[in-house]
Amino acid sequence: NWPPDSGAPDPFEDGVVIDYRVFGSNNPNTIDIPGGGGQLPVKGRTPVHEVGHYFGLRHIWGDGGTLGPNDCAQSDGINDTPFANAQSAFDCDTTRNTCTQVELHYSEDVPDLVENYMDYASEECMNMFTNGQVALMRNVLEGPRSGLLMPFSAVTEAEQVLSFDILPNPSDDQFSVVLEI
């Protein structure tokens, strides 16, 4: 899904690295809005967004301004994601409509999809992927990332009974991982 000249990561550097401070729906942390626009509450959606990239998804505005002009001709490559000419303003404005042409998939003009995990909306309103995005992620998981799939039978009986605790939980500093065999 990434264009050849996009600078996508080298396969040997492949993976997802996510700051521990962005996990959890009851997270007390905030994220600074780029450009000094304030702070956003963290609701655990950043990991979903980043893993979406790992499974082949682009931002819903098609990365205009980064990989091309910021305009309504940019696309994320998914037919059922409405066009947007830029990222959202880190808010939940469901009336925002930056591209007013009729969408072929919907047969009408539809607003920007700020509820989508692949936008930069406030994490409080992110709650969905489109069916097309789900299909692409499944294709990536069954294709280039098929090595992540492992049959259950490959797990030994001893590994099946392992459990662990993270203490204290939640933690904003140091924590311990306790394995129980």
What are these regions (language model features)?
Residues 1-48, 54-160:
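Extracellular (secreted or membrane-anchored) zinc-dependent metallopeptidases
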Residues 157-181:
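Surface-exposed, proline-anchored Ser/Thr-rich loop/turn motifs
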